[in-house]
Structures are given as C-alpha cells and as structure tokens.
Amino acid sequence: MAKGQFPVEKLQQIETPFYYYDAELLRETLRSINAEAQKHEGFVVHFAVKANANPRVLRIIREAGLGADCVSGGEIEASVKAGFPSTKIVYAGVGKADWEINLGLDNDIFCFNVESIPELEVINELAAARGKTARVAFRLNPNVGAHTHANITTGLAENKFGIAMRDMLSVIGEAEKLSNVKFVGLHFHIGSQILDMGDFEALCNRVNELQDELDRHRIRVEHINVGGGLGVDYAHPNRVPIPDFKAYFDTYARHLRLRPGQTLHFELGRAVVAQCGSLITRTLYIKKGSVKQFCIVDAGFTDLIRPALYQAYHKIENITSDEPTEAYDVVGPICESTDVFAKQIDLNRCHRGDLLAIRSAGAYGEIMASQYNCRQLPHGYMSDEI
C-alpha cells in the first residue's frame, strides 16, 4: 500500500497504536500463492499461524483454501475457531505439552511433526489412551545454513529443532514398533526471511539424498514438508508488495524429486501477511537533542518487537505530512534504551499528532505484542471494516 493510499481521515479517528491490514492486498497475495502452487501437482500450502493469528486474517486465509501450520495448542484452537478443516492442520514444535497433543488428537489433525523419540513415545501413549492412531512426520535437521539473521536460522546442527539426519532410520524404526502412531512424512525448516533461492535448492538436494536412502531401505513416505522461509522486501513494500511465489515454487518443482503419489507441503507465514499489515502510531513529541532529533511516538517495542529483537528494518512513513524531509530517530515510550524503531531516517517533517505507518508489520507484529510496562495490547483493524 503506497503512502497516499492510506485512508488517513479514518485512521485519525482510531486510538493509536493499532495494526491496519489491507484486506485486498492479503487476498491478492493469496491468489498469487494459489495460482503458482496449483501449477505443480501435489503442492499443498499451509499458513504458519505463528506469523499472525488475528481472527479476521485467519478467516481470509482459510477462505483461500490454505491449511494451518501450528506450533502450540493455542494456535490449534485459533485455527479450528477460524474454520480450518482438521485435515489441513499440522502441528510442529520442539516442546509439545500433553494437553496440546491431546488437543491435536481430539481434533484428528493431519499430522504431528515430531522432533524427538521421547516426544514420539508420549504421542503414542496419549493416542493409545484415546484409542486413536496419530499420524506423524519426523522433523529432520538438514544442517543447511540459510542466509538470514542468526536468530531465525533453524536448520543447523547447533539449533534446538529437529532430529539429526544420521538418526533418521533409527527413529523410523522406533515408530514402527509403536502401535498408535503411523509414520507418514518428513519435515524440514531451515529458517525465515530467506531471499536466496539457492538456500531452498540446497534443501532440495538434501531431501533428495535422504529419499534415496529411504528407497534403499524400501521405506516410502506419503508427504514431504519443506517448511516455509520465503522472505519479503522490507525496504520496498510499495514496489514489491507480493513476493515472487513463482520463483519459490518453481525452485522446488525443478530440484526436488517427489516419488509417485507424494505430496509436497509448504508452511508460508511472513510471505503471506507481512506486506498487508502496518503499525499505525501517533507522534507525541519532537525532541531536539544535542546531536540529533527524536520523533517520539506512542507505539513501542511492546507493539512491534522485531527492530529491538532482530535489529530488523521496517520502512516508516509520515502519512499525514508532505513537508520537506528531516532526519529523526523514531523511538517509543518504553522504559528501555532498545525501544527504537529506526535511527536517523528521513521523514516528512513531523509534528505532534502526525500519524506514522511502520510498514511490512503484518508478520510477527501483532502476534508478538506484550504488556510490558503494563501497556495495553494493540488492536487490529481490516481495511474493509473501518
């Protein structure tokens, strides 16, 4: 959404800070995902609910036909409430509590992505108590390093996620000994905010090697889940509002060798929702320091933690001013020195009351908000509802 396309008069009437979602851009993004994925037989797309669990956002995504990728019992509950069919819900996570596993069993979800033998044994025990058989896939750690921030790299041997590749056959053997789990797939996830298709190609090569090994042992799996990880252009949200899903899906179609009848599952989060969301915040004060000036706004890292947590860049725009630009540090009210959205960025001259839009905030924004300093959680509003 370009700067001039924000409904400023309507936004001025809403108490800040809040999240504003462009419903049409979200739908356009989903249409692009479906158009490109459907070119390839057996491609199945799930939305990574951890990126955004706003109820209206989830409903729009469910209406587009995507499944849900969940990493907690709460996300399973949110997905069920939003109307996702249980047959399209997958549940991953390195530390699944008993009640969360039981929730998945009670809802007959598509698959548990299992990360250890002890977890597998607990799932088997809980499934037996309910007289059910749980479908499980094993999350393998492919030791593929993604070119992204260290805090969102998940596919290296040093990370807490997944089972070592060398243990693949032994964990499959353990599953075959248990009567209330059914081994159906392999799961991978190498990281997030990946823009280099070479990283996904490297994952494909590793998956091909593992499948070849399974073939040698006459082991067949129903599906391969390669996770998500596709990034977005935070620097140019207006120029590149929709990621290159064609290049993404084509990479897997060219380089990953599926067996006959296998399905290939994806778990896209950021790429689906990041660009449709903006954090709208109001300017409280312009403070002139000895060497710089500060634009102090009413949003803080309690509302959008990515800049403080990951040193992440978000484009910021003054959507109520067309005056000449000046350099500002944009900072929030939280009692921490890390409560900074940007340093020395050029904005149209800011005044008290001006609205700023912190762009590309639809993923890992509202969902990661906290009440530190006893602050209220921000609300979310859809463009077609205000």
Segments the model singles out, each with a brief description of its role:
Residues 143-285, 347, 373:
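Active-site loop/helix belt of alpha/beta enzymes
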Residues 25, 52, 75, 96, ...:
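Short, glycine-/Ser/Thr-/acidic-enriched flexible segments
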Residues 48, 135-141, 187-189, 225-227, ...:
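Short beta-strand segments
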Residues 22-25, 29, 33, 53, ...:
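General structural feature for long, well-ordered alpha-helical segments within catalytic domains
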Residues 39-41, 128-131, 216-217, 237-240, ...:
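Short, glycine- and charge-enriched coil/turn segments that flank and shape catalytic ligand pockets
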Residues 46, 135, 223, 263, ...:
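Hydrophobic "anchor" residues on beta-strands that sit immediately upstream
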Residues 1-134, 177-182, 212, 216-219, ...:
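A charged N-terminal "starter" segment
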